């Protein structure tokens, strides 16, 4: 494994450890960012279940997006996951950035999820 990937894995583990301590029973809003798409899930770690999920590959979004790898796609995914989480009865979450820097697509997704009604 390269040093860059090892550093990402270390950051990811560090962020998850801190979240586990601060969660207080709240579900986790987990982000995965690939080079071409962005994915997000609302996970209940106590039950080990995914409560809501959205990605730039969803049929609702894919036709309206130019690409799944830009800020506009991240904003659309953030709004969609907030809508689905509220439908599942979730309003308070902890944000798991998965070791990614809170900038660009990750920040755009988080801001859109907040605007959509998620509290973190």
UniProtKB/Swiss-Prot annotation:
SUPFAM superfamilies: Translational machinery components. Gene3D superfamilies: 3.30.420.100. InterPro entries: Ribosomal_uL18_bac-type, Ribosomal_uL18_bac/euk. One of its GO terms (biological process) is translation. Pfam families: Ribosomal_L18p. The keyword rRNA-binding applies. The keyword Hydrolase does not apply. GO terms for molecular function: 5S rRNA binding; structural constituent of ribosome. GO terms for cellular component: cytosolic large ribosomal subunit. Keywords: Ribonucleoprotein, Ribosomal protein, RNA-binding, rRNA-binding. Part of the 50S ribosomal subunit; part of the 5S rRNA/L5/L18/L25 subcomplex. Contacts the 5S and 23S rRNAs. PANTHER family: 39S RIBOSOMAL PROTEIN L18, MITOCHONDRIAL, LARGE RIBOSOMAL SUBUNIT PROTEIN UL18M. This is one of the proteins that bind and probably mediate the attachment of the 5S RNA into the large ribosomal subunit, where it forms part of the central protuberance. Belongs to the universal ribosomal protein uL18 family. NCBIfam families: L18_bact. This is Large ribosomal subunit protein uL18. It comes from Methylorubrum extorquens (strain PA1).
């Amino acid at each position: 494994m390269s040093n860059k990937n090892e550093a990402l894995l270390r950051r990811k583990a560090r962020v998850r450890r801190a979240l586990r301590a601060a969660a207080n029973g709240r579900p986790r809003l987990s982000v995965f960012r690939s080079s071409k798409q962005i994915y997000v899930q609302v996970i209940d770690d106590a039950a080990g279940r995914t409560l809501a999920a959205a990605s730039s590959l969803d049929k609702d979004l894919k036709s309206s997006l130019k690409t799944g790898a830009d800020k506009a796609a991240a904003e659309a995914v953030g709004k969609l996951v907030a809508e689905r989480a509220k439908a599942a009865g979730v309003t308070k979450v902890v944000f798991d950035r998965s070791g990614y820097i809170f900038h660009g697509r990750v920040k755009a997704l988080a801001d859109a999820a907040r605007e959509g009604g998620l509290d973190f």
